[in-house]
């Protein structure tokens, strides 16, 4: 099964949650008026699209309806789909780190699939013939994280730099940077601790890591990706808010998109924070993590044919 098919299947619950509601609004009104827009607004917000994104999407839709002189609600559906796609467009430089010597930090609470995402991202980059090192792990307080990364190293062929459980995370990064330079690696992927309970400690830890990178590899391109579990819905927004206070988040990996009713969160996040979703995960295999593409995502959500992308 191609990635688009998997994504479409994975978004079934989200589709039932959002799209069936949208369709009933379109079919339940005979004219486009304030009541129509109010009903559509409520449906989008209830579907985890979020208040900010919903307002922006509806403002855009109203303009398009006016420009195109549309009277029939059923004719709005494609315009709504187009508005959502535009809202989620990443722009030109979303994956600039692939073209540079880079350090990519993966950040997030424990249990969201952070270490697995490091492994899958390593697999994606290895498939582009990049030389990849995984810092295994800056999350040195969780022995299982090191075992997991070792397993991913075996599966993907990416190198791993590991120290014993309880080592200083900044020291792990220091060793990993030295290995990066010696082995002429393209990308260093860093797993980080997921403890938000004590924000002060986490901030200090991330600052220490930043200082090491700044001192040892200042010309490296930096990317800080937060890993969020799509099944947590609005809770994912809270996590992003908390971590964004601690460090500069540049992108999002949205995991567990297969089987969640809360996939609308992908739209909400980008509108509310202006931080792009860069990867989405729909399963356990390496190829089940893919670059985010707004057309592919929205087509899968609305069950629209994705043309030649069917087996991406």
Where are these regions (language model features)?
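Charged, compositionally biased N-terminal leader segments and the immediate start
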Residues: 1-25
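Residue-level signature of catalytic and energy-coupling elements of molecular machines
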Residues: 11, 48-50, 109, 139, ...
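Short amphipathic alpha-helical/adjacent loop interface patches that line ligand
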Residues: 11, 15, 122, 206, ...
